[in-house]
A protein has these predicted regions:
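Alpha-helical bundle/repeat cores within regulatory domains of eukaryotic proteins
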Residues: 211-216, 220, 233-257
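Alpha-helical segments in soluble extracytoplasmic regions
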Residues: 182, 186-189, 193
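Extended alpha-helical solenoid scaffold regions that build the rod-like backbones
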Residues: 1-175, 193-205, 209, 213, ...
Length: 257
């Protein structure tokens, strides 16, 4: 089981500024670039030079590029979903930020593949075009891996929602004189997750994740609120106040809430 948490995803301003300087524009889309992705791009550039300067090796270069990107995809999966980074980098756990950056790195590779394909196509014989279908298979592999990472992000938050909804259902609100901690914790952790995914993932992906997470929050918290034993007017006011806070914070993240 891979330890997955929301910890450590809200970087300080200096870190944010540094990360903004590590963006790569591909077409009209901007991608965050980690060191590993930068090294991959350098190696792909070397392959491109080989293809242009020695077109007689285009078929071989195609195979090298495909195999190289397959290894990148596989290694990314092992490091993040397989928790390889915990062993190689000494991390205590894999955070939502690690997952989001991994997904972004895959998006960058997917954005570069069409250009690589066109470059190779210009240096292949017509009878060799069938080899280009390997790029389609590669893109599908990248996409499937991305879906797994997105699902893991949803799973992280789903686990936290379950914890907080159970805690709320078991809270004696009649003895509380302040905010309900389960709701406070849920608001904080949801905000943390979406600060991360908004920073590193495309808007369409963020929307997909938010829809799934908010559906889970709505269902579980509704059941938990119904289960709360309210016996005093103050307890009722407290519960209503915190539910309104939850709605306000969720709406701030996604206006469709």
């Amino acid at each position: 089981c891979v330890p997955l948490t929301l910890d450590g995803e809200a970087p300080h301003d200096a870190v944010v500024e540094s990360e903004q300087q590590r963006q790569l524009l591909v077409g009209s889309d901007s991608y965050f670039v980690v060191r590993a992705s930068g090294q991959v791009i350098e190696l792909l550039s070397d392959y491109a030079r080989v293809i242009v300067n020695m077109p007689m090796f285009a078929v071989e270069a195609l195979g090298w590029v495909i195999e190289f990107l397959k290894q990148f995809n596989s290694r990314t999966c092992q490091v993040v979903l397989g928790a390889g980074a915990m062993r190689s980098a000494g991390l205590k756990n894999i955070t939502a930020r690690h997952l989001a950056i991994a997904a972004q790195s895959l998006s960058l590779m997917m954005a570069l593949v069409p250009s690589l394909r066109e470059l190779l196509k210009r240096h292949l014989k017509t009878t060799q075009f069938v080899l280009l279908s390997d790029f389609d298979k590669l893109q599908n592999d990248f996409r499937e891996h991305q879906y797994e990472i997105h699902a893991k992000l949803v799973s992280i938050m789903g686990d936290r929602v379950q914890v907080h909804s159970k805690a709320l259902a078991n809270t004696d609100v009649n003895k509380c004189d302040g905010h309900l901690q389960p709701i406070q914790d849920l608001v904080r952790e949801t905000g943390t997750l979406f600060r991360v995914v908004t920073q590193f993932l495309q808007p369409a992906v963020v929307q997909t994740i938010s829809t799934r997470v908010f559906t889970d929050i709505d269902m579980r918290m509704s059941h938990a609120i119904t289960a709360v034993d309210v016996r005093t007017l103050d307890a009722h006011k407290l519960l209503i106040s915190d539910v309104e806070l939850l709605n306000e914070k969720m709406h701030a993240i996604d206006a469709s809430w």
